[in-house]
């Protein structure tokens, strides 16, 4: 009886260690049949999607735009890239405080990030309203390369 119990425990441990894919975590993209990474993220399709959006947004700063585009072209999962969000996309903006050379606000981002996989549409969709923190630079017209480097470092920590 003890032997049967040990066999059952070993079998359950082995089953827990097997990689199991759900349709959402398929190994292959339903669009191009290429390999996917985290939760069905297809690097090829998502890179093409983001490239197609490049002409439709700009931060107004060449260095910031290049940084955002770099993260989008090198993303390996849905929450691994930066995105330019126009100020008009935020509601309920509330001042929190200031320090150094910036001010911090809380706000509601009405669209939210692209984090939800829609099985029917077979594409990533936005979450809807989500609370976020905004940082406003006091001298944002003259963003330095050291500030861009700081953004790069913060992105690597995410």
Please place each PLM-identified region on the residue numbering.
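Intrinsically disordered, low-complexity regulatory segments of kinases
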Residues: 1-158
């Amino acid at each position: 009886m003890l032997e049967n119990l040990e066999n059952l425990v070993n079998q359950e441990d082995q089953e827990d260690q097997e990689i199991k894919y759900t349709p959402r975590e398929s190994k292959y993209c339903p669009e191009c049949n290429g390999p996917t990474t985290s939760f069905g993220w297809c690097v090829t399709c998502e890179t093409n999607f983001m490239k197609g959006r490049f002409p439709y947004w700009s931060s107004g700063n060449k260095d910031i735009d290049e940084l955002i585009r770099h993260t989008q072209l090198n993303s390996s999962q849905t929450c691994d890239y930066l995105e330019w969000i126009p100020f008009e996309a935020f509601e309920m903006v509330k001042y929190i405080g200031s320090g150094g050379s910036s001010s911090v606000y809380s706000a509601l981002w009405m669209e939210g990030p692209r984090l939800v996989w829609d099985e029917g549409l077979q594409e990533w969709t936005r979450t809807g309203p989500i609370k976020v923190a905004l940082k406003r630079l006091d001298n944002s017209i003259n963003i330095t390369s050291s500030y861009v480097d700081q953004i790069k470092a913060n992105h690597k920590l995410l």
